[in-house]
Amino acid sequence: MKRGLQLVLMLCVFLLGTQVSFAGGLLGGTGVSDARVYDSEGLIKIQTLAIADSIYNGPTSEGEPEIDDIPEILMNGTLVDKKNVLNYISYREVCQNIKIARHIDILRLDSRKAFKEYKNNIGLYADAYVITTISNGTSMNDGTRLNVFFDVYNARTNKIVYAYRKLAPKSAVRDSLLYTEIAKDFFSDFIDAQKQAIEDKEKEDKAILKLEKEEAKKAK
């Protein structure tokens, strides 16, 4: 009887573990990540995040997303924000707004001029923008692991606020699913980082208030 219960418990644990693995989108995971907050005050103030044009030279292996697929993949990544903590605006939407307001079609400019116009105008539409840089080597067989960098900049000062990097497993299949899951990982971690920054600020404010009250009592 005891042995039977142990087997049932082991099966439940196995099934639960399998469910969690698939819930992440990929059984093998999306790799290792690291993140850094450069400006916690700026991070707290972000309510609208714009998805800027990505830096990507195109697929180097079969099944990898095309350049034109990346904007949709990044926007699909925002779906992880089920509580709508942030507002998101796509690159094309920003370009359309600039075209209407400034009569400048960014989509027709070369990458350098387009980025300059984007930086000069993005502050009208968002609090921050994220630039995604994809480093995928020359082929899947060249030994290079997929590296994806997400750098978030203040839309008004263009100073970096937050950086996130994902290093995919060497054996990972570089398809749209992997890229989408990596995007979801970024947005999820970004939201968590903002939440943590808010909590830290609240604790700091309470500590300062407590100290001020203690100093006021001593002064009486």
Which positions does each model-derived feature cover?
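C-terminal/domain-edge helix-coil "capping" segments
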Residues: 23-50, 109, 120-124, 139-220
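Bacterial N-terminal signal peptides that target proteins for export
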Residues: 1-9
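Solvent-exposed loop/turn segments at secondary-structure junctions
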Residues: 56-59, 93-96, 135-140, 168-173
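Short, charged, low-hydrophobicity "junction" segments
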Residues: 18, 23-26, 99-106
